[in-house]
Amino acid sequence: MSDNGQNSASPHIPVMLADVLDVLKPRDGGVYVDGTFGAGGYTRAILGSADCAVLAIDRDPTAILRGRALATEFAGRLTLIEGRFGDMKRLVRELGHGTVDGVVLDIGVSSMQLDQAERGFSFQQDGPLDMRMGGEGPSAADVVNHFDEADLARIIAVYGEEKRARAVARAIVAARQTAELHRTLELADLVASVIHRKPQDRIHPATRTFQALRIFVNDELGELARGLSGAEDLLHEGGRLAVVAFHSLEDRIVKRFLTARTGRAGRANRYMPERDEVAPSFREIAHKAMKASEEEVEINVRARSAKLRAAERTAAPALPLDLAALGFRAVPTLDGSLA
């Protein structure tokens, strides 16, 4: 995810690339999954460091189209897959791969998507209020124009961690009585009229609302949970997982997932009964999240908020996915609220 100010870098620079390669340790003959292909930065580096193969997944058809040149450059070693990384287990197995050697995920919206006003992700450029990464399903405009006030407030509070979510939702509902909201700057200006920017504020008043709508429209947190579970199923013993997250919402999910699967979860408190002993499906590569160096942050501002968590697969069976244990909270559903 780009930094909260939406100061995207162009061309796209893969964050913590050297650290990711050090985690994955690509080897000749290996098969690796880049679940968030984007501009192909991680994929290119993996293919360039060993005579291996990469299965690159992206739900954005424009990313797949741009990736064709890279597939030509690394003929026979790069397979481009249009789809969601949350479905990686099915997508990879359909290609005949039972297991893989490594998985890398770079979570959130890409700087390229922010730079394209017509995609509707940016509150700094005027464009259609869309925000769909893959172009399918209801758009952000559908959400702001059809969800009731309580549902909008819940989405903005949970996914944007916006303290004034109720006031923002109230303003949206009032504004659409006169005219529906269909442009990004319309919504950004409306939110700014509710959340007045203070001189010391580092982020735009609409940052959290736009983040919440984007996460909701694309089911980003559900996608992340399913992707982590899919990686757990696909990685063979010794296979490695590297996840780069830019926001606390995503990083908390990754942390909880790996904490549970490395055997560090323990009891929630001393009054809870002991859990049955379960063999850890991952072992830690680093106890804490890794952060970008000061030198990298100077070159690439996106790296400022990046956290890399990594683990190595054990021989133990994969554990069932438990969304509640990952901290998921109840929110409206796209289908239910738009029906």
UniProtKB/Swiss-Prot annotation:
Gene Ontology CC, one term: cytoplasm
Keyword hit for Ligase: no
InterPro entries documented for this protein: RsmH, SAM-dep_MeTrfase_MraW_recog, SAM-dependent_MTases_sf
UniProt keyword annotations, A-Z: Cytoplasm, Methyltransferase, rRNA processing, S-adenosyl-L-methionine, Transferase
Amino acids binding S-adenosyl-L-methionine: 40-42, 58, 85, 106, 113
Location within or outside the cell: Cytoplasm
Enzyme Commission code(s) on record: 2.1.1.199
Catalysed reactions, semicolon-separated: cytidine(1402) in 16S rRNA + S-adenosyl-L-methionine = N(4)-methylcytidine(1402) in 16S rRNA + S-adenosyl-L-homocysteine + H(+)
Pfam families: Methyltransf_5 (PF01795)
Protein's GO biological process: rRNA base methylation
Membership in a protein family: Belongs to the methyltransferase superfamily. RsmH family.
Reported function: Specifically methylates the N4 position of cytidine in position 1402 (C1402) of 16S rRNA.
PANTHER family xref list: 12S RRNA N4-METHYLCYTIDINE METHYLTRANSFERASE, S-ADENOSYL-METHYLTRANSFERASE MRAW
Descriptive protein name: Ribosomal RNA small subunit methyltransferase H
Organism lineage string: Bacteria, Pseudomonadati, Pseudomonadota, Alphaproteobacteria, Hyphomicrobiales
